[in-house]
Regions:
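Compact alpha-helical subdomains of small soluble proteins
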Residues: 97-100, 105-106
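Short acidic/histidine-centered micro-motifs embedded in hydrophobic/aromatic stretches
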Residues: 105-109, 124-125
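Acidic, glycine/proline-rich low-complexity segments that act as flexible tails and inter-domain linkers
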Residues: 3-5, 9-66, 87-94, 118-132
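Glycine-rich anion/phosphate-binding loops
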Residues: 84
Length: 132
């Protein structure tokens, strides 16, 4: 099961910034962007992203979208995925996390995923926060 979870995180992390800028509740917009970004080259991946990630995982009631953003940002920091982190920081703010909470998450993750990952995350956060 952990392999499936890891694959879902990587799939989520691979979406471009424009997709993650939409609030998670805007499912139709997210689906159309998924199709636009990858549907012509990877239709099955686009379908799984729409039907599993956005329509199921992000909508499950066991975690709020704010909490899902916190989990996703933490995973992206741990995996040192700065390109995907940028878009998910935007999404995290849209889902109710504050800049202070996101910086605290980066600081906390430094002790679990390493200083280089945290330093990279701080640089990305600084750029995202400046784009207000």
């Amino acid at each position: 099961m952990s392999g499936i979870f890891a694959a879902a995180i990587v799939m989520a992390a691979g979406m471009e910034a424009s997709m993650a800028q939409e609030p998670a509740s805007n499912l139709d917009s997210a689906k159309s962007r998924t199709q636009h970004l990858m549907g012509d080259i990877a239709p099955k991946l686009a379908e799984l992203t729409d039907d599993v990630l956005y329509a199921d995982i992000w909508e499950r009631p066991q975690l709020s979208q704010r909490d899902r953003s916190l989990v996703t940002v933490s995973a992206l920091i741990a995996l040192n995925r700065p390109d995907q982190l940028r878009s998910h920081l935007v999404r995290a703010k849209a889902n109710g996390l504050t800049e202070e909470q996101l910086v605290e998450t980066i600081t906390h993750m430094a002790f679990y995923s390493g200083w280089p990952s945290a330093v990279s995350a701080v640089a990305i956060a600084k750029e995202v926060f400046a784009e207000k």
